[in-house]
Every structure is written in structure tokens, then in C-alpha cells.
Amino acid sequence: MFPAVNEIKVQTWRRDQRGECPRRSAQCRLFSCAHRECAPAARSLENRGPENRTARPEATMSGDVLCNGHSAFHRLLKHSSSRTHEALVVKIIQENKNTPLFCTAPEPRRDSGVNGEFLLNSAELQDEQTLPLHCIHSAADITSSKHRKPARRKVKRSTKRAAESKSPANRKVTDYFPIRRSSRKSKSELKYEEKQHIDTLISNGIEDGMMVRFIEGKGRGVFATQPFQKGQYVVEYHGDLLQITDAKQREALYAQDPSTGCYMYYFQYLSKTYCVDATKESDRLGRLINHSKNGNCQTKLHAIAGKPHLILVASRDIQEGEELLYDYGDRSKSSIEAHPWLKH
């Protein structure tokens, strides 16, 4: 389809070498012929009837044909010696535009003519109006359209929507929750606090959560008055800390008196052997805890300022009212003969 314009200049010519009217002196009915001999014939065709005036182009002395934007293009054909289908090339130049459009339409074959010329009557001209026209842009226009970038439609978004779309990406945890210092403590901090607590209990001699009861046929025993969790500090096995040589001398003295019990506990600390002697009577409860192979407590070393202390911790959860027991670890024959309860 051609764009609607107010006035279009149309130039028509025959595809020959000269581009002139082949009849020269004879009357020519071509609308585009501007020869003086052909002008009367062109004017006679204009006076044929009103039915052809609406679609009839106007001839000018310059060889151009003027037609309005709503009328069809009338093609004027001439027969060549080869009698093949020729194409009529119409050069359309729009007003105020530099890029020309070339339109071609196939030339139908005619079976009759006069002296090699084929003329179109009004009926044929009306039929020719229905023939399609093929528009071809110039080469410069085609190449420029290939390199032309497609235009993008710019859509303005409101600043409020843009802010809302960007806000989720810029959100921080502190926007939802206030900043506060974590109350969780590391494992090393917990161990340090536990050690400080045990140091305080040992240094001050605090022994809570237990009491002494008398057991018939067995003697005194220590019972829990509160539950203890596994690994929790229970009590210190308090006594005199001795080197191995001093401990052996005291043990020989205690052996001379059969009524004296044995409350000496040997252990190693930093590749040295030590002994805690709790034989001397005192109000400390750790020395009164009885022996059992399946006890609920176990011994453990605890150093304060480089000095080892022997303490008892719960080997399992201890309920309130249970007797506190631990394994003495002495399996010698002499000890078992002197104290048969060490077997159990």
C-alpha cells in the first residue's frame, strides 16, 4: 500500500534505449507523451466520457503525469518485437522526500494491435487497476534499515514503585529485629566460669547438698539432699597433700595401730606421685563417702594456682536421697584381707 499524499509526481517511460516516442510524426495515445504531434490525441482521450475522468491522470508538458492520492495508476504498454511480458517501471517521487520508491507491475499479453502497437481502451484500463503493484525501496534505504536499531518504548515508572521494588533487596536483619548483644556463651567461657565456681567452693570449704547418716552394719555414709547432674561437682576429698616419700612413712605408722582406718589416696600429677591423707578426723564430708565398684561418683584432679586437689564429681545423674559412693580402686591382696568390703 502507498501512503496517502496530496500530490504525487509519476514519471513513466518505456524500457528502450532512447526513451522517446517511437511514432514521432503519428498520433500517439500515450498519456505521458509530450510531443506536439501527440498532444491533440491526448486531449481527445480526455473528452471521451465522465466515467474515465475520475481515474484519468493529467498530462503535463514536462512529461510527468499528475494524479491525486486516491486514483489508481494507469499503465500504458507497448509491444516489443519479442512479444514477452514487459514491466512498466513507475518512479514515484513524494513531495518533500528524498528517498524514491520503485513500483513494478507485470505487463499482460495483447493479441491484437496496429503496426506493432497495443492500445488500451477504457474497460481494459479499469481491469488494469486491479493488478497488484510491488513496491521496492532503494538500496540505500534497505541497507540503512538493516543497521537501524529497533526503537524501545520508554515507560516511566513512578518513584514510589521503584523505591518499593528496591527496598526488599536493601532490607537488613536490623530493620526487623533490634540490635542486641547475644546472651550465648562460648564453650571456653562456660568452662572458665565452671572452674571459677569450683575454685570458690574448694577455697571456702563449701559442701552443700549432702548429709551424714548412720548405716547399721556398715557405719557412716553420705547421702544426697539434692539432685546432681552428670559431671557436676559434688565434694572435695580434703586432706593433707603429701609427696610419695612422706606418704609411705605415714602409712607405716598407721599400720602399727589396727584401730586406725586408712584414708590415704594416691594419684599422679605432672609425672609426680602425690597422696591426699584424710586420716585425721574432721568435719569434711568427702572422707566419709563409702566404696562401691558401681558407684555414682568418680575422682578427678582440679588444680588451683598449680596445686592439685582431689574432687568427686557425679558419674551419672544422682537423685535426692541416694547414697554417694565411688570406687577406691585398691585391689591388692593385703588390702582385701584387711578390708573384705573392697570386693564389692
Curated annotation (Swiss-Prot):
<dbReference type="GO" id="GO:0043516">
    <property type="term" value="P:regulation of DNA damage response, signal transduction by p53 class mediator"/>
</dbReference>
<dbReference type="GO" id="GO:0042054">
    <property type="term" value="F:histone methyltransferase activity"/>
</dbReference>
<dbReference type="InterPro" id="IPR047266">
    <property type="entry name" value="KMT5A-like_SET"/>
</dbReference>
<feature type="compositionally biased region" description="Basic residues">
    <location>
        <begin position="145"/>
        <end position="160"/>
    </location>
</feature>
<keyword id="KW-0539">Nucleus</keyword>
<dbReference type="GO" id="GO:0032259">
    <property type="term" value="P:methylation"/>
</dbReference>
<protein>
    <recommendedName>
        <fullName>N-lysine methyltransferase KMT5A-A</fullName>
        <ecNumber>2.1.1.-</ecNumber>
        <ecNumber>2.1.1.361</ecNumber>
    </recommendedName>
</protein>
<feature type="binding site">
    <location>
        <begin position="290"/>
        <end position="291"/>
    </location>
    <ligand>
        <name>S-adenosyl-L-methionine</name>
    </ligand>
</feature>
<dbReference type="Pfam" id="PF00856">
    <property type="entry name" value="SET"/>
</dbReference>
<keyword id="KW-0158">Chromosome</keyword>
<dbReference type="GO" id="GO:0051301">
    <property type="term" value="P:cell division"/>
</dbReference>
<keyword id="KW-0156">Chromatin regulator</keyword>
<dbReference type="GO" id="GO:0006357">
    <property type="term" value="P:regulation of transcription by RNA polymerase II"/>
</dbReference>
<dbReference type="GO" id="GO:0005700">
    <property type="term" value="C:polytene chromosome"/>
</dbReference>
<keyword id="KW-0498">Mitosis</keyword>
<dbReference type="InterPro" id="IPR051760">
    <property type="entry name" value="KMT5A"/>
</dbReference>
<dbReference type="GO" id="GO:0009953">
    <property type="term" value="P:dorsal/ventral pattern formation"/>
</dbReference>
<dbReference type="GO" id="GO:0140944">
    <property type="term" value="F:histone H4K20 monomethyltransferase activity"/>
</dbReference>
<dbReference type="GO" id="GO:0042799">
    <property type="term" value="F:histone H4K20 methyltransferase activity"/>
</dbReference>
<feature type="region of interest" description="Disordered">
    <location>
        <begin position="143"/>
        <end position="176"/>
    </location>
</feature>
<keyword id="KW-0805">Transcription regulation</keyword>
<keyword id="KW-0808">Transferase</keyword>
<feature type="binding site">
    <location>
        <position position="263"/>
    </location>
    <ligand>
        <name>S-adenosyl-L-methionine</name>
    </ligand>
</feature>
<dbReference type="GO" id="GO:0005634">
    <property type="term" value="C:nucleus"/>
</dbReference>
<feature type="binding site">
    <location>
        <begin position="218"/>
        <end position="220"/>
    </location>
    <ligand>
        <name>S-adenosyl-L-methionine</name>
    </ligand>
</feature>
<feature type="domain" description="SET">
    <location>
        <begin position="208"/>
        <end position="329"/>
    </location>
</feature>
<keyword id="KW-0131">Cell cycle</keyword>
<dbReference type="InterPro" id="IPR001214">
    <property type="entry name" value="SET_dom"/>
</dbReference>
<dbReference type="InterPro" id="IPR016858">
    <property type="entry name" value="KMT5A-like"/>
</dbReference>
<keyword id="KW-0132">Cell division</keyword>
<comment type="function">
    <text>Protein-lysine N-methyltransferase that monomethylates both histones and non-histone proteins. Specifically monomethylates 'Lys-20' of histone H4 (H4K20me1). H4K20me1 is enriched during mitosis and represents a specific tag for epigenetic transcriptional repression. Mainly functions in euchromatin regions, thereby playing a central role in the silencing of euchromatic genes. Required for cell proliferation, probably by contributing to the maintenance of proper higher-order structure of DNA during mitosis. Involved in chromosome condensation and proper cytokinesis.</text>
</comment>
<keyword id="KW-0678">Repressor</keyword>
<comment type="similarity">
    <text>Belongs to the class V-like SAM-binding methyltransferase superfamily. Histone-lysine methyltransferase family. PR/SET subfamily.</text>
</comment>
<dbReference type="GO" id="GO:0010628">
    <property type="term" value="P:positive regulation of gene expression"/>
</dbReference>
<dbReference type="InterPro" id="IPR046341">
    <property type="entry name" value="SET_dom_sf"/>
</dbReference>
<keyword id="KW-0804">Transcription</keyword>
<keyword id="KW-0949">S-adenosyl-L-methionine</keyword>
<keyword id="KW-0489">Methyltransferase</keyword>
